[in-house]
Amino acid sequence: MSAPTVPGAGIGLDDLPLRANLRGKKPYGAPQLTVPVQLNTNENPHPPSKALVDDVAESIRAVAAELHRYPDRDAVALRADLAAYLTRQTGIAVDTANVWAANGSNEILQQLLQAFGGPGRRALGFVPSYSMHPIISEGIDTEWVEARRNADFSLDIDHAVATIAERRPDVVFVTSPNNPTGHSIPGADLARILDAAPGIVVVDEAYAEFSAQPSAIGLIDRYPAKLVVSRTMSKAFAFAGGRLGYLVAAPAVIDALLLVRLPYHLSVVTQAAARAALRHADETLASVAELAAQRDRVAAELAASGFRVVPSDANFLLFGRFADAPRAWQRYLDHGVLIRDVGIPGHLRATIGLAAENDEFLRVSRLLAADELINDESDESTGTP
């Protein structure tokens, strides 16, 4: 018996009328592997509590009888819950009208670029930073412009302001804490970027709950026509599988997104599950302090083993300097530890996990330190993200 055929398998991308600016590109692809220690995608390693699982299950059961109807198109109840959470977490009063939600923060970023980017428009980011910013920009036919960070991955605010003045981007991305380096931007520096920017400034606060830096939300009243703060429930909130991202901005920004969002984009199941997760916010976020303490412990032990560790305000560490980062990544994997090669020469990124996971990561790191690290202190190359 012949093997089953796959209809249409005889063609490839080159045979399709793909847009020219997408040819040769690669999709986002963090490895998803089953290994003993998974420290590569910056999730909260603590699973949801039984109380949260039960609440999610009951909440979904309650709405299941209405699955034949479309969900609340504007997710008003969920947005109200998010506004209440933000008001408590940041100490800044936030109203339902300031909040918008979508399927993960990547959909939030996509909607923002649909509204404020597009053909003939330009987006700028300070690299190395979150790899989805250029991918989403180019996917919406927005010109992507890179501005470099310092050799130590910090942001040179004078250079940043000068680059914005020169390139005049329609959208500026500022990630704080920055992924994959971990730096947070001080409020005074962010204000300088907002003053210089001619268009929208998106402050990506995916890891904000881990940071000691005040949220950029406090600047919205001062820059209502420019500032958008993007957040997610995938990191500190331990809700990565639930796929819920949101933003905070002036109500007019939400009105703009209503022009480009798909109707009924948030399912009734997603809305119910996210609201249940928000009811358990205090319990879930109690792990943040513990993860921050683990981060500091891991950073200190890596440094003691001879690694250079970039100071981090998030739940991950960028560290090196490896003679061959892809080879070192594979050796970690061979030992059952999955971390992330983010494409920065000489460096790898590790998520902070549970204490036992961190112990195993550190054990393997000590093994690799003997023959994988560069000893030449003069090479400060940062490469590209």
Curated annotation (Swiss-Prot):
Cofactor entry: pyridoxal 5'-phosphate
Enzyme nomenclature, EC number: 2.6.1.9
GO biological process, one term: L-histidine biosynthetic process
Reactions accelerated catalytically: L-histidinol phosphate + 2-oxoglutarate = 3-(imidazol-4-yl)-2-oxopropyl phosphate + L-glutamate
Keywords: Amino-acid biosynthesis, Aminotransferase, Histidine biosynthesis, Pyridoxal phosphate, Transferase
N6-(pyridoxal phosphate)lysine found at: 235
Pathway(s) where this gene product acts: Amino-acid biosynthesis; L-histidine biosynthesis; L-histidine from 5-phospho-alpha-D-ribose 1-diphosphate: step 7/9
PROSITE patterns (UniProt xref): AA_TRANSFER_CLASS_2
Pfam families reported in the protein's UniProt record: Aminotran_1_2
tRNA-binding recorded as keyword: no
Keyword Glycoprotein: no
Gene Ontology MF annotations: histidinol-phosphate transaminase activity; pyridoxal phosphate binding
Family to which this protein belongs: Belongs to the class-II pyridoxal-phosphate-dependent aminotransferase family. Histidinol-phosphate aminotransferase subfamily.
Complex and partners: Homodimer.
Protein name, as recorded: Histidinol-phosphate aminotransferase
Organism, scientific name: Nocardia farcinica (strain IFM 10152)
Gene: hisC
